[in-house]
Amino acid sequence: MQQNKVDLPPVRASGALLSLAGVGKVFSNGVTALDNVDLAIGEGDFVSLLGPSGCGKSTALRIIAGLSLPTSGTLEWRGGSFDRSGIGFVFQEPTLLPWASVFDNVWLPLRLRGVSKAKAAPAIMEMLSRVHLDGFAEAVPRELSGGMKMRVSIARALVTKPRLLLMDEPFAALDEITRFRLNDDLLSLWRDERFTAIFVTHSVFESVFLSSRIVVMAARPGRVFEELAVEAAYPRDEAFRTSPDYAALCRRASDVLSAAMQANGGGRDDGH
């Protein structure tokens, strides 16, 4: 079924928001996590890093976030520098403060920037509404499902209005129906908030549904194997998930992922 087009963030014509050139990472134990990675991320892009375990997807995110330094190569931001306070990060584990309310968990990054609870309240309540957690502001994490905890984590990452959102397999531990709903909501947030997104995943299906571009990585050492443009209009919904176009894009991405895994001597990855 043909998808209705919507306006996307003004992207790709404006050039890369960030570029990795020849980036390598060798850990202290001698393991090479990344080798000569070249990657450009356009402002407004939704890019998935897809690949088997050990291909350096998470390491690349940490380097971009400034949580790890590359052993070699360069990371360049458009304009020469980038305030990393403009980066949001969503991890696989929600990492919520167990004793704090949902409201206070989302307030945390604003609190660390000196924003009072009263001043932050409108932005927090708006973001909780955007992630469908109306009525849960005073709940604590033990009262929430896994999917709801992830919604809190997404709200916390986006409440500061980041320019770049990094996500490290955020939905991997959730059931398929919850993942579908979160994928739908994440795309809605991406369109409305107009941030750039880098999404790490093992799932072919998830990467095709979400992304404007997929970067398939190979392991041992971690490197870019091939980049795929996802030529499908937004918005993407249940009709897109059941369309022949989606099935064809998934087959193509799966074939490239299989080739990448063969390039590093086999290994297993179920595409999820």
At which residue positions do the language-model features occur?
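Helix-to-loop junction immediately C-terminal to a conserved catalytic motif
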Residues: 65
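Conserved signature/switch motifs of ABC ATPase nucleotide-binding domains
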Residues: 139-142, 160
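The feature captures the beta-strand-to-loop junction immediately N-terminal to the Walker
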Residues: 50-52
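Hydrophobic anchor residue at the start of the ABC signature
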Residues: 154
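Conserved ABC ATPase "signature" region
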Residues: 107, 111, 118-136, 188
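Conserved ABC transporter NBD signature motif
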Residues: 73-85
